[in-house]
Swiss-Prot record:
Pfam families from the UniProt entry: UPF0270
Protein family membership: Belongs to the UPF0270 family.
Name used for this protein in its record: UPF0270 protein IL0325
Taxonomy, superkingdom: Bacteria
Record-linked NCBIfam families: PRK04966.1
Source species of the chain: Idiomarina loihiensis (strain ATCC BAA-735 / DSM 15497 / L2-TR)
Gene3D superfamilies to which the protein is assigned, alphabetical: YehU-like
Length: 78
């Protein structure tokens, strides 16, 4: 189920973004990014529509995924 980020309380959204970044672990890319930068990038992906927040009833978990990976899987076509 897609959860619109705009409907989530700002503090809750911040906590969710931080939790997801912490779950991702260490990034061994060519340039190490700060925790704050990673959180901000994740928020920007949501705001741009590139990513969406999804809740899995099966796993009772919340995650941020690319919008393309869930498009067409929602009952209302979102």
């Amino acid at each position: 189920m897609i959860i619109p980020w705009q409907e989530i309380d700002q503090e809750t959204l911040n906590n969710l973004m931080e939790s997801i970044v912490l779950r991702e672990g260490t990034d061994y890319g060519s340039q190490e990014l700060s925790f704050e930068t990673k959180v901000e990038q994740l928020k920007q992906r949501l705001k741009s529509g590139e990513a969406v927040i999804v809740y899995s009833e099966l796993h009772e978990s919340v995650d941020v995924v690319n919008k393309d990976s869930v498009t067409g899987n929602e009952p209302d076509g979102q």
